[in-house]
């Protein structure tokens, strides 16, 4: 509170950046954690809350006749434009927000003061919900080829890896340590995902310290051990996710990429995902387009294209699809790296796992995926998200791109994810909110030093409490789809209004009024039809009679033979109109065109997997050992 000199300012206007209607007038409050604006002109009390940690920039605009404007841009893409009557009040609020939004010490972050009135035991249970050993066991590890080792328990192998890592059983301790000395920051090749169907593996690491000619026998042995852990393939891929020119430039600094002549039976491939600085610039250009007050459709589309944002999303998706196809179709193991192996590598390894394994498309599985590939493996959340007052060049929307890639997949396969768009937005918001300890720090060692697991709470129990509102009603369970094969042609990628224009009220100027009304009418009709069908199902909720249960069982068998549907376009004559949030109208009621028997089977199947997931979650929360990531 020492940073707050003016906790309350009255007669503050909140401008609507899309319309010319009269600005709201109210009172602005500054608390220890939030900026709160209370609209006094509204008939019903209306409040706008902005978490200090969500604030990306605060800008004092030139003085006007109406007062002193204050423009706030948030990391969750909320934009608030206030006009404060007195210049002195505006300056004091501006100064306070600069300090409150950019704390210097980790202990000043919201998570260390957040108190949800939860007992110490319940907090510990929350941190036990995700156990990565259980996920490795689900893959069949340990086995004859792979083992979980504690060689890094004192962080001597790599200080940004977790204490336990999965390496080939054939790799000796000397091989592991020798390889770590040849890899940037000691980030040796470790297992990310094992495809049990054919023993092909996705592994990850950082770039080698090869320069123009250096080599390392232990590193060559490590890659050989990874290749031999997959007897079904005579070769393995080594994928560098950087543009080739960037990787070659790193050679001059004594780093670079693997020389195929030094490694047996590897196939090297560059993918070409740009670095964090290009991505940061691209997002800024995208947001400038989104904030244009009255763009024409042509201007908006031109600006979207010039930002390059969707091209970068496509590049990440292309790399992930390549990994998934190499593992599934070619039965080859893949080793992935970028520069340090914690940005682009995390993106493509996690997305490839998501494409291959339906478990990661469920609530708990997605949490496990984030814990395993992002948190445990040392993605620098603190730096990339700008949690503390630091180098702005380290900030980059790497995790935002991952979340958007998942959303793009949800648009192509609306029945394959247990969760909906709001689940992704909740996670994205809390990556920046610093309300929970999961995303603080840069690696496991740093989180231990900060005593994150003793002093803060985990996000995952909080999200599970909201499971009902975050569930996708179209979800068909684990068995409906195994591997996903998305279309990555440019026209397959949509602009995500639900992310970048989420806080904009009313209709955007770039929308045609008639199209908007027609979309709303079509949506209303489909929802009414859906409501009628649900009313007809209500009698079944009391439980069917024995003979009815037998009938339903037979219906389920028949329905299982029905071909699965991917998208609404599969059973619509033409592509449905797209709503303002990026969701196609057909997605809202995709099951309305499926026969009644298939819907009953879908409902039964979804509930079965939901109950199974909850049972597993509860049992692990009670019995599992603490696994801090």
Swiss-Prot record:
Xref: Pfam families: Myotub-related (PF06602), PH-GRAM_MTMR6-like (PF21098)
Myotubularin phosphatase domain mapped to chain residues: 126-500
InterPro entries referenced in this protein's UniProt entry, alphabetically: MTMR8_PTP (IPR030591), Myotubularin (IPR030564), Myotubularin-like_Pase_dom (IPR010569), PH-like_dom_sf (IPR011993), Prot-tyrosine_phosphatase-like (IPR029021), Tyr_Pase_AS (IPR016130), Tyr_Pase_cat (IPR003595)
Protein residues bound to a 1,2-diacyl-sn-glycero-3-phospho-(1D-myo-inositol-3,5-bisphosphate): 250, 275-276, 339-344, 380, 384
PROSITE patterns: PPASE_MYOTUBULARIN (PS51339), TYR_PHOSPHATASE_1 (PS00383)
Domain of life of the native organism: Eukaryota
EC class: hydrolase
GO terms, biological process: phosphatidylinositol dephosphorylation
Gene Ontology molecular function: phosphatidylinositol-3,5-bisphosphate 3-phosphatase activity; phosphatidylinositol-3,5-bisphosphate phosphatase activity; phosphatidylinositol-3-phosphate phosphatase activity
Protein EC: 3.1.3.95
Binding-site positions, a 1,2-diacyl-sn-glycero-3-phospho-(1D-myo-inositol-3-phosphate): 250, 275-276, 339-344, 384
Signal peptide residues on this chain, from the entry's feature table: none
The keyword Coiled coil appears for this protein: yes
GO cellular component, one term: cytoplasm
Active site: 338
Keywords assigned: Coiled coil, Hydrolase, Lipid metabolism, Nucleus
Family named by the database record: Belongs to the protein-tyrosine phosphatase family. Non-receptor class myotubularin subfamily.
Quaternary data: Homodimer.
Name of the molecule in the record: Phosphatidylinositol-3,5-bisphosphate 3-phosphatase MTMR8
Organism name: Gallus gallus
Organism classification: Eukaryota, Metazoa, Chordata, Craniata, Vertebrata
Gene: MTMR8
